[in-house]
Amino acid sequence: EEERRSYIQVLDQKSMRLKVLIEDLFEVSKASSGTVTLHPEHVDIISLLKQVRFELSDKMSASGIEFRFNLPEGRVILYLDSQKTYRIFENLLVNIAKYGMPGTRAYIQVVREPEGYVNISMRNVSAQELNVSPEELTERFVRGDSSRNTEGSGLGLAIARSFVEVQGGSMKIEVEDDLFRVVIRWKENAQEGKEAREGQNQERQNQERQNQEGSLGAEEKPGMEVYRGPE
């Protein structure tokens, strides 16, 4: 009876992995052929990245890797499909958690370039020396390690690249021995980016003005309540 339950459990696990494989293969095939349906909207990728980080916090902690995020203050608005972009970030962070070396650090950074592009980079140390080229890593079913002893379809990077490119961006992978780095580059919507930066500057100026007024008010009339206007 115990042996039978064990066999059933193994079959359930294999069935689930096959289901994931089929779904992932279907997704990457649609994206590669250009038949994927997009629902673009103005997305704050900083908030989205923080959401992915929160929802993967247990998996990231269990990996033994220290994830360091260097994110700009305020919003970075891009015109993207939020669900597809979430999947991109999720796949890349899960890839680090699965294949990164425990006890090392992973660095995630978002940088606005002067010429109107936004770069999202993730770099980490692989648990094993990467024995394939960057091009091969984004091919279907390639994982970059010879043991292939971890769960997954091997499609994570391929899906991420396809979803980046179908949304007008580029995804570059750099490999040197056991060092792994991926850089996503998207063009920022000029008007939205300008409005977001102006909004951030205005918020910063308002905060500085309020701090100065509060300081002056406190010096002139201690204990006086300073009216800030409607919330």
Question: What is each of the regions a protein language model found here?
Answer:
Residues 103-116:
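Short beta-strand/loop element within the Bergerat-fold HATPase_c
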Residues 129-142:
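Short conserved segment of the HATPase_c
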Residues 33-38, 77-80:
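Conserved micro-motifs of the catalytic ATP-binding
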Residues 39-42, 61, 66-76:
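Conserved catalytic submotifs in the C-terminal HATPase_c
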Residues 13-18:
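Short alpha-helical segment of the dimerization/phosphotransfer core of two-component systems
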Residues 96-97:
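Short helix-loop "hinge" at the ATP-lid/N-box region of the Bergerat-fold HATPase_c
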